[in-house]
Amino acid sequence: MWLYLAVFVGLYHLLHWYRERQVLSHLREKYVFITGCDSSFGKLLARQLDARGLRVLAACLTEKGAEQLRGQTSDRLETVTLDVTKTESVAAAAQWVKEHVGERGLWGLVNNAGISLPMAPNELLTKQDFVTILDVNLLGVIDVTLSLLPLVRKARGRVVNVSSITGQVSLFGGGYCISKYGMEAFSDSLRRELSYFGVKVAMIEPGYFKTALTSKERFLKSFLEIWDQSSPEVKEVCSEKILAVYKKFAEQLEQKCTQDLSLVTNCMEHALIACHPRTHYSAGWDAKLLYLPMSYMPTFLVDAIIYWDSASPAKAL
């Protein structure tokens, strides 16, 4: 019996390995539009797909970022400036994409643009602090996606949304985790709706990686500004112990972060060019071995783990 079971498990893994490595043909004819290509994941993915021979349409927030990217890639890659928080900018970029892809349609849409700050305990933040992040990470994703869906549907292509492990486990206050939970929900409904048209939707859920989003200096500067603007009452409740905890978190953040960004961009590439893409990709060992298992744990256990690594307020009961 055990022999049959071992053979069955071996055959299953062999079949899975084979399916994972099947790649689409005619890649040089496929157009992929990527947001947030000024740095980090977006920039690396644009270069990676360009080297693969795909027709990359890279959206950058700044002309400087676009110019740097063009200098590192082939003449096939084209750039456009895009602010995902401005509907007129999104509409102009969508028209630009339509003119480039023509009747072929758009094979791939990668929603990568995102921000992480401001981040702090919820009571220290204002409504505008939440709006700032949601405008980019969630509403921007929705606006770009809805603007380009007709082109993706025409190509029977792929939508790849870059979320985070914090879309599975809420680790801290502020709009970032909320935006990623929202992106997960949007992607789930989108995947089901578009499956009728041959379009596949994938979620990339990285752990901690060393990018501009995890910069210690930017994080500390943002948190200190939030603290300085908070009311005396809130400061008294939270106490300066919170300051020390967040400073320690910032110091440890860069040490926790994985430096190999290709672990993420390889997942994004697979979602775009594999014959059988997954619906969810966990990138990084922390995502696979810690945060993904945590998402299946009972709430009381997840809370206990997070309490263990955080400080209680001065006025806690």
Locate predicted features.
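Conserved NAD(P)H cofactor-binding loop of Rossmann-fold oxidoreductase domains
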Residues: 112-118
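Substrate-binding pocket helix/loop in short-chain dehydrogenase/reductase
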Residues: 120-122, 129-131
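Active-site helix of classical SDR
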Residues: 145, 179-182
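Residue(s) in the substrate-gating loop at a strand-loop-helix junction
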Residues: 164
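SDR active-site lid
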Residues: 196-278
